[in-house]
Amino acid sequence: MIDARYLGDYKVWLEFNDGRKGVVDLSDELHGEELEPLRNRDRFSEFYLDYGLASIAWLDGQDFTPEFLYDKLKAMN
């Protein structure tokens, strides 16, 4: 992943290094104890691009694997 931008309503525009890009909706993925705090839209919007993980992450340690996001992007677009 080389770029990520928050669009609102848990939607994130992603770009991967192979040229694939598009929008993923993560609203249905925020379940479980670790991800529950991200249901707060303000908190969700504070993700950053972690170049070590090649994915988006949050300061409290939550993240999605790049493979998961790539597959979700392929399925949505």
Spans of model-derived segments:
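Motif-centric detector for short Cys/His coordination patterns
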Residues: 1-77
